């Protein structure tokens, strides 16, 4: 049961705009670095490995802490956690722009990850609390425009700002947007869960989760350098497997677990969350395709970002279409249609062996299908996950759902980048990009199968 300060409060457009602006601090601004990797190498006088760590660490830390933050939002207040997240983004952005020291870049990006971990589940919970029925679906559509739409715009946005104003302006603008979001959310009554007791936070679960995910990230990003037979590689693999096994055992026994596995008894929630993880994993497409056209075809970051304009346009248009399809067809069909269309787009973008002019045409069309598919998928998936969560666990459920988003993006970028680098070194940059993009298409196919098997045609939602 919810217990907001003013039970009669209903969500309005002012609050919704503040929520969307807070969401894009991660999905638009923080994610824009996928298209400015070469520029950051020069600006910080460092190697691509360090820059790739800085690019992926935000989503990684967001994913590691988002579930815990969702639980804290349920216990201590969703408005409070949202405001804390916005302030953390301002701090992280300041650390990134004040110097050319790579360590501060990484620390700033890490703090931005913590910011996103606070904002995402808290804002979804606010929507669950203060918007009802079609108003909630509308609010979720705009939330999806901030998240999926922001990820669609980020490549072009990052390239345009970096080319025209300088890359630091990405984060200057992020600070300005954060201040506006704080102003718009101010005055909204607090909402928190009444039924969850304030038990001790699951520190053991969080530590094990962090150890597991950091070990996996290092294995993916540095595995080829370490060598699969090296002692360090084997040790990290053992740590990852061991910490994962221990995490499962402890979480099932814990009275107040970091991840409540009972949520996954609902097939609709499980299907939405698992497919969400995989479709966020195809974010690796952006870093591979952008790096390929810059390194292989000699394009600038602005030119590379311009290829994805069709992605930008379609994802923004189709999110509201996805909302209407949800209302008329239910959740499963739009999720399947969106995923299928995305796979077609992914295959077109992977045709790196074509002559430049034909590849550019395929990229433009491919990104169009890419954005169209994600736009159709976004709102039905988010609504399925949130509507199937118990009201008293909505913060944790939203946290797990957005953990899937963040970790999918982090590992998608890391894995795609690793495959791209390894295959390029073994063959050439064209084959490396093609194989890495095929990996993303495979994730889309697996997502399609999961939706087909787990998401029911008519799921019973809690609206």
Curated annotation (Swiss-Prot):
Gene3D superfamilies membership: MFS general substrate transporter like domains, Multidrug resistance protein D
Residues annotated as transmembrane: 17-37, 53-73, 86-106, 107-127, 142-162, 165-185, 201-221, 230-250, 273-293, 299-319, 334-354, 357-377, 403-423, 435-455
GO terms for cellular component: plasma membrane
Pfam family, any one: MFS_1
InterPro entries: MFS, MFS_dom, MFS_trans_sf
GO process annotations (BP): response to antibiotic
Top-rank taxon: Bacteria
Membrane topology: Multi-pass membrane protein
GO molecular-function term, one example from the UniProt record: transmembrane transporter activity
Subcellular location field: Cell membrane
Keywords: Antibiotic resistance, Cell membrane, Membrane, Transmembrane, Transmembrane helix, Transport
Family: Belongs to the major facilitator superfamily. TCR/Tet family.
Primary role: Multidrug efflux pump that acts independently of NorA and is one of the factors that confers resistance against diverse quinolones and chemical compounds.
Annotated protein name in UniProt: Quinolone resistance protein NorB
């Amino acid at each position: 049961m919810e217990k907001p300060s003013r039970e009669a409060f209903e969500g309005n457009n002012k609050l919704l705009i503040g929520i969307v602006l807070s969401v894009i601090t991660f999905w638009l601004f923080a994610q824009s670095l996928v298209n400015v990797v070469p520029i950051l190498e020069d600006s910080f006088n460092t190697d691509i490995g360090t820059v790739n760590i800085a690019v992926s660490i935000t989503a990684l830390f967001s994913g590691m802490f988002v579930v815990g933050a969702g639980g804290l939002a349920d216990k201590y207040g969703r408005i409070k956690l949202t405001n804390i997240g916005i302030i953390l983004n301002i701090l992280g952005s300041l650390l990134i722009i004040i110097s050319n020291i790579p360590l501060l870049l990484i620390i700033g990006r890490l703090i931005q990850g913590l910011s996103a971990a606070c904002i995402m589940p808290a804002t979804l919970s606010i929507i669950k609390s203060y918007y009802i029925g079609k108003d909630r679906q509308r609010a979720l559509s705009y939330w999806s425009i901030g998240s999926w739409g922001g990820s669609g715009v980020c490549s072009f946005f990052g390239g345009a700002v970096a080319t025209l104003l300088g890359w630091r302006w990405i984060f200057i603008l992020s600070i300005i947007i954060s201040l506006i979001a704080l102003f718009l959310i101010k005055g909204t009554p607090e909402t928190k869960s009444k039924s969850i007791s304030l038990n001790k936070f699951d520190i053991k679960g969080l530590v094990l989760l962090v150890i597991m995910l950091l070990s996996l990230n290092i294995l993916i990003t540095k595995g080829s350098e370490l060598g699969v037979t090296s002692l360090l590689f084997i040790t990290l693999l053992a740590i990852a497997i061991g910490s994962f096994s221990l995490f499962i055992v402890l979480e099932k026994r814990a009275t107040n677990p970091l991840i409540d596995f009972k949520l996954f008894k609902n097939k609709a929630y499980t299907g939405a969350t698992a497919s969400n993880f995989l479709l966020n994993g195809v974010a690796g497409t952006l870093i591979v395709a952008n790096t390929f056209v810059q390194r292989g075809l000699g394009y600038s970051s602005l030119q590379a970002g311009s290829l994805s304009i069709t992605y930008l346009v379609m994802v923004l248009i189709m999110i509201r279409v996805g909302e209407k399809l949800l209302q008329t067809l239910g959740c499963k069909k739009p999720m399947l249609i969106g995923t299928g269309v995305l796979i077609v787009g992914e295959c077109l973008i992977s045709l790196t062996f074509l002559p430049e002019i034909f590849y550019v045409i395929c990229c433009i069309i491919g990104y169009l299908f890419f954005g169209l598919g994600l736009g159709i998928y976004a709102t039905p998936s988010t609504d399925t996950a949130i509507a199937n969560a118990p009201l008293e666990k909505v913060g944790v459920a939203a946290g797990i759902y957005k953990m899937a988003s963040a970790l999918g993006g982090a590992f998608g970028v890391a894995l795609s980048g690793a495959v791209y680098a390894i295959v390029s070194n073994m063959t050439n940059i064209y084959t490396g990009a093609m194989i890495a993009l095929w990996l993303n298409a495979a994730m889309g196919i697996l997502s399609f199968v999961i939706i087909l098997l787990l998401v029911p045609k008519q799921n019973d939602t809690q609206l």
